[in-house]
C-alpha cells in the first residue's frame, strides 16, 4: 500500500482555506472514498505526488496535456515569452498566430474570439446565439456539462453527476425556464421539443462526443439530425468542443464526423495546459461580437501571451499522423482493459472516441445519461483505489473519461492493462 500521509496533512490544511479544500469539486475524491492526492510535478506521461509516489497519468489535467506533462518545446517557449512580459492588456502577434491555426484547422470557424476558460466560451456563445436569433431558449442534453454558467447548469454531468445534483442552488427559476433538456442521442425528443418551442429556441448546444457522463459518442445520424432540425427552425447549432477540440481529430470532432456547426466552443488542448477558451464560427455571426457588433464580451487576461504561446506551441506539434498514433494507443488500451475485465467477469462497457476512453462498470450499452447511471459506483470506487495503489492515476469519477498523450509509451499502456488485470483479480477474489 502506498503512503499518502503528506497529502492527508495538506488536505487538512486546505479544507480550512478553500471550500471543500479544493478549487474544483471533482478534485475532492469524494466519490472514490479517498483523501485528495496532492501533486508535485509531472514529466511526460508520469505524475508525482508530494509523498513521492509515481503514477502513469490518464487525467492529463482533465484533457489539455495532449503532449504530456512539461513538453520541452512548450516549456522553453513559455520561458522565453515570460521574460518579455506576462500580459499587456493590448494585442500581441501571438494572438494572431494561434487564431490562424484555429481557423485553419476547425472547419466551421472563420473568426475566433479568445477567452480564459471553457465556461466563458460557452456562456459567450449562448449570448451571441440569443443576440443573433433574437430568441431566448437554449436546448442542451441530459448529463452534458458545458461549464458552470447558470443557463447550462441544468441536469449537468461531470462533478454534478458524481454529487447527484440535477442542478445547483443559486440558479434562478427565471433562468432555468429558458433551458430545455432532452436525452443525448435521442432525435425524437429533440424534434418533439422543437415542435413545441421551435420558434423560441435560439440554439442547441451539444458535445459532439459527450465527455461528462463518461465518454459517449454520437449514434449514427444524431449529429446529422441536429444539423437538419436546427436549420429547419432557424436555430443555431453550437458544438461544445472544449473537450473534443484537437483531442479526437486534427480537425476536431466536427471534422471527424463531417458536420459543421454554426458556432464552436474550444478550450483545454488549445491552451496547452494554461487557462484558455475560445468561441468562433461564421463571420456573419461572429461580427455581432463587440467591438464589431452589439453583443458584449470582454476579459482582462483574454489572449495573454503565456496562454497563446502554450496553445500555439501545442497545436504546432500536432499533425494528422499524431492522431493516428494516439488512436492506435487508445485502441490497444481499450481492448486490453476489455480483455482483462472479461477474464474476471467484471461488468463493463467501454466507449472510445479518438484518444478518449470511457470505462463504465455496467454491461448495458452506454448511449446517454440514463444508461451511464447504471454503472456500479461502488465497484468503480474500489477499482479506483486499487489502481491508484498500482501507480495508475485515473479521473476520480465514473462520469469522466481517460485521456492519452503522445508521451504515453506502449510500455505504459501494457503496464496499465496488467495492473487492471491484477486489480480485477483482487476485486473478484
From Swiss-Prot:
Residues with N6-(pyridoxal phosphate)lysine modification: 268
Pfam families recorded: Aminotran_3
GO cellular component: cytoplasm
Xref: Gene3D superfamilies: Aspartate Aminotransferase, domain 1 (3.90.1150.10), Type I PLP-dependent aspartate aminotransferase-like (Major domain) (3.40.640.10)
Protein name (database record): Glutamate-1-semialdehyde 2,1-aminomutase 2
Catalysed reactions, semicolon-separated: (S)-4-amino-5-oxopentanoate = 5-aminolevulinate
Subunit structure: Homodimer.
Pathway of action: Porphyrin-containing compound metabolism; protoporphyrin-IX biosynthesis; 5-aminolevulinate from L-glutamyl-tRNA(Glu): step 2/2
Species for this entry: Geobacillus kaustophilus (strain HTA426)
GO biological process: protoporphyrinogen IX biosynthetic process
InterPro entries listed in its UniProt record: 4pyrrol_synth_GluAld_NH2Trfase, Aminotrans_3, Aminotrans_3_PPA_site, PyrdxlP-dep_Trfase, PyrdxlP-dep_Trfase_major, PyrdxlP-dep_Trfase_small
Protein's gene: hemL2
Amino acid at each position: 500500500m502506498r503512503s499518502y500521509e503528506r497529502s492527508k496533512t495538506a488536505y487538512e490544511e486546505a479544507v480550512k482555506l478553500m471550500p471543500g479544500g479544493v478549487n474544483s469539486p471533482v478534485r475532492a475524491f469524494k466519490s472514490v472514498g479517498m483523501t485528495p492526492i496532492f501533486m508535485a510535478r509531472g514529466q511526460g506521461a508520469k505524475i508525482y505526488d508530494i509523498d513521492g509516489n509515481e503514477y502513469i497519468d490518464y487525467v492529463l489535467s482533465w484533457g489539455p496535456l495532449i503532449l504530456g506533462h512539461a513538453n520541452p518545446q512548450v516549456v522553453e517557449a513559455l520561458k522565453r515569452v515570460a521574460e518579455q512580459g506576462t500580459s499587456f492588456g493590448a494585442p500581441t502577434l501571438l494572438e494572431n498566430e494561434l487564431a490562424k491555426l484555429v481557423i485553419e484547422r476547425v472547419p466551421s470557424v472563420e473568426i475566433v474570439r479568445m477567452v480564459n476558460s471553457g465556461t466563458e466560451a460557452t456562456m459567450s456563445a449562448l449570448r451571441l446565439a440569443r443576440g443573433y436569433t433574437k430568441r431566448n431558449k437554449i436546448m442542451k442534453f441530459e448529463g452534458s456539462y458545458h461549464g458552470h454558467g447558470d443557463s447550462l447548469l441544468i441536469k449537468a454531468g461531470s462533478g454534478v453527476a458524481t454529487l447527484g445534483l440535477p442542478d445547483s442552488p443559486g440558479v434562478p427559476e427565471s433562468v432555468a425556464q429558458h433551458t430545455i433538456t432532452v436525452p443525448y442521442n435521442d432525435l425524437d425528443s429533440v424534434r418533439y421539443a422543437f415542435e413545441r418551442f421551435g420558434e423560441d429556441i435560439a440554439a442547441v448546444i451539444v458535445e459532439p462526443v459527450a465527455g461528462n457522463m463518461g465518454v459517449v459518442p454520437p449514434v449514427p445520424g444524431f449529429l446529422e439530425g441536429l444539423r437538419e432540425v436546427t436549420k429547419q427552425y432557424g436555430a443555431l447549432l453550437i458544438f461544445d468542443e472544449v473537450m473534443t477540440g484537437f483531442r479526437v481529430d486534427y480537425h476536431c470532432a466536427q471534422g471527424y464526423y463531417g458536420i459543421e456547426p454554426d458556432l464552436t466552443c474550444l478550450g483545454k488542448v488549445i491552451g496547452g495546459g494554461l487557462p484558455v477558451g475560445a468561441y468562433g464560427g461564421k463571420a456573419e455571426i461572429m461580427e455581432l461580437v463587440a467591438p464589431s457588433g452589439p453583443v458584449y464580451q470582454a476579459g482582462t487576461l483574454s489572449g495573454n501571451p503565456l496562454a497563446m504561446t502554450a496553445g500555439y506551441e501545442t497545436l504546432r506539434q500536432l499533425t494528422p499522423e499524431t492522431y493516428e498514433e494516439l488512436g492506435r494507443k487508445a485502441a490497444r488500451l481499450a481492448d486490453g482493459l476489455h480483455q482483462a475485465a472479461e477474464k474476471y467477469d467484471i461488468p463493463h462497457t467501454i466507449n472510445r472516441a479518438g484518444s478518449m476512453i470511457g470505462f463504465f462498470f455496467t454491461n448495458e450499452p452506454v448511449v446517454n445519461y440514463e444508461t451511464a447511471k447504471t454503472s456500479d459506483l461502488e465497484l468503480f470506487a474500489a477499482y479506483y483505489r486499487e489502481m491508484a495503489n498500482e501507480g495508475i492515476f485515473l479521473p476520480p469519477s465514473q462520469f469522466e473519461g481517460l485521456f492519452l498523450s503522445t508521451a504515453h509509451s506502449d510500455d505504459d499502456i501494457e503496464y496499465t492493462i496488467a495492473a487492471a488485470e491484477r486489480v480485477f483479480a483482487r476485486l473478484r477474489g
